């Protein structure tokens, strides 16, 4: 049993069957469940994933909330340590936006085994100083 951390794109892809990342997101989440991994989503990424459903209304938001509860996906709050690590990542890697730095920092602070993202622009795990394997969908 390990810890799989997902970014917003994975949850968005899982929820939207028309999304280019749907099948890969589905496989990533079911794989984590099959391994009995804890699945964690940073609170910042959860907020990002709720933007589209929020535009569609409260019922769409409820669908996401129910999925998160059923899977279950743990929502990791933004802590001072995560914020500090994200700032250091952002300062060192100028191409990484703050939302992505928060996801990476959460993986680092939680010592995740696997970080699943739809972003292909991130530096390697070695350059990021991560123990986690990065899976890019």
Where do the language-model regions lie?
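Short beta-strand scaffold positions
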Residues: 6, 40-41, 77, 98, ...
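Short, hinge-like loop/turn segments at secondary-structure boundaries
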Residues: 56-60, 93-94, 132-135
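Short, well-structured N-terminal submotif of metal-dependent ribonuclease cores
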Residues: 1-41, 53-66
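Alpha-helix capping/helix-boundary segments
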Residues: 10, 45, 82, 102-103, ...
């Amino acid at each position: 049993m390990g810890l799989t951390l997902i970014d917003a794109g994975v949850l968005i892809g899982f929820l939207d069957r028309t999304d280019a990342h749907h099948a890969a997101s589905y496989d990533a989440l079911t794989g984590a469940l099959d391994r009995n991994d804890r699945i964690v989503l940073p609170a910042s990424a959860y907020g990002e994933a709720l933007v589209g459903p929020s535009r569609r209304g409260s019922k769409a938001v409820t669908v996401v909330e129910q999925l998160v509860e059923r899977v279950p996906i743990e929502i990791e709050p933004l802590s001072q340590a995560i914020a500090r690590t994200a700032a250091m990542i952002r300062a060192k890697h100028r191409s990484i936006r703050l939302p992505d730095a928060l996801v990476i920092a959460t993986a680092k602070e939680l010592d995740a085994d696997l970080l699943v993202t739809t972003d292909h622009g991130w530096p390697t795990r070695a350059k990021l100083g991560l123990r986690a394997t990065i899976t890019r969908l």
